Regions:
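An extended, acidic
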Residues: 144-260
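N-terminal subdomain of lithium-sensitive/metallo-dependent phosphomonoesterases centered on the IMPase/IPPase/PAP
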Residues: 1-85, 258-260
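A short, compositionally biased
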Residues: 26, 99, 127-131, 217, ...
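DPxDG-like acidic metal-binding loop motif
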Residues: 75-134
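A structural micro-motif at secondary-structure boundaries
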Residues: 135-141
Length: 260
């Protein structure tokens, strides 16, 4: 299958995500453990199978990196990256608005198109190089807000908890309130809209990060990678405050290690 441009490709991808959910969500869902502090459901698996089958048919020469069946494939060059159900733990625990399907297309190691779909609200978010970010087909850019009126969202794991807790301590009088959502797709979309003044998460698997990060880039968010973390903000003021706090925490951690 050929697409004329990245915008058309992003539209193809969102249609595919919608079709996959419509087909697969009718099945009974089983939940299983997936390593330490993680879950996988039968819906994850059936969605991934549906989407990858379609991609292989329409783009037979393009490799696919995906969470459940193709996670060992090297994320390099030109490829699709897919998270069939991002926010699985939220989904498995009945948090029905806090999960989504996401995909991105990477060309020569550069993300050029992505799509995110939220079934609970039937909401679509797409991004395409040279075209921008779109909510349900309508182009948008991030909405700035004063830091004092903004939410700071962190996406954390057990391994990051101490660092993130210290970050919240540093910023508790800067931002209005804090949130922990636990779904990369939701986090990035909310940050791209300006619903979060700041978002902090560890740079992780390509299927978790690339679709939403590209959306935030195309929505003209402020984005910085610091150490192993990604910081997304709706203003320079918010970005500066988060970076300043992070640098202080990292410096203190280094000093503690040296003292030992």
């Amino acid at each position: 299958m050929k697409t004329r441009n990245y915008l058309e490709l992003s539209q193809y991808m969102i249609k595919l995500l919608k079709a996959a959910y419509k087909k697969c969500s009718k099945q009974k869902v089983d939940v299983k453990d997936k390593g330490s502090s993680d879950l996988v459901t039968s819906l994850d698996l059936s969605l991934e199978k549906f989407i990858t089958t379609a991609l292989k048919k329409d783009f037979p020469e393009t490799k696919i990196v995906s969470e459940e069946f193709n996670s060992k494939i090297e994320a390099k060059g030109t490829y699709f990256v897919l998270d069939p159900l991002d926010g699985t733990i939220n989904f498995a625990n009945g948090l029905n608005s806090l999960y989504g399907l996401q995909i991105a297309y990477i060309e020569n190691d550069v993300t050029v198109a992505s799509a995110i779909y939220f079934p609970s609200s039937d909401s679509s978010y797409t991004a395409a190089k040279n075209f921008g970010a779109f909510e349900n087909g309508k182009k948008y850019v991030v909405t700035p807000k004063p830091v004092s009126h903004s939410l700071l969202n962190i996406n954390t794991t057990r391994a990051d908890f101490d660092t993130m807790y210290k970050l919240l301590e540093e910023l508790k009088y800067k931002f209005l309130r804090f949130r922990i959502i636990g779904a990369d797709c939701y986090d990035f979309v909310s940050a791209s809209l300006g619903n979060f003044g700041g978002l902090v998460m560890r740079n992780g698997n390509s299927w978790d990060i690339l679709p939403g990060l590209f959306l935030a880039e195309q929505a003209e968010c402020k984005i910085t990678t610091y150490k192993d973390y990604i910081i997304v903000s709706n203003t320079e003021e918010a970005q500066s405050a988060i970076l300043k706090a992070f640098r202080k925490i990292i410096k203190q951690q280094k000093e503690c290690k040296s003292a030992k």
